[in-house]
Amino acid sequence: MERFREILIDIALSKTIPNYQDLLDEGKKRRDICAYFDGKYCNKFKVSRGNVPASWISNNKMVPHPIMCFVCPYFSLRYYEGKQIELDLFDILLYYEELKETIEKELIFIENKMNETGFSLLLKRRREELISLLNDVVTKIKVLKELIKIFR
């Protein structure tokens, strides 16, 4: 049954998300090295509703679908003691929307600075890093919007 739910999620998302398999592979890598994943369940999220991207849900715990691990903002290599939080896709989307806005503001600031002072290797490198991060955030926002359409 666990695999069935995962396959249904894959079918629904693979049609609407370009390079879905790459994102799925990245999510699997993140899940396998995340400090909150104990090999069976995600210990960061508490699940009280069944409308979340999980391969399996049992006793308020979930086996996260790899695409959930791809968009998870709590991914960590170190375990931080803290309470479990209720999984809410809208909260995660809001987090990424705010992050996107912050990155865009910093990009504008850097571009203005580059226009004023001329070429700066440090500013150019920071700008490239921010553009890469922005692309990653935009991808996660698109994935989250698709997940919300499916699981609302």
Enumerate the language-model features and the residues they cover.
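Cysteine-centered metal-binding/redox modules
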Residues: 2-128, 132-152
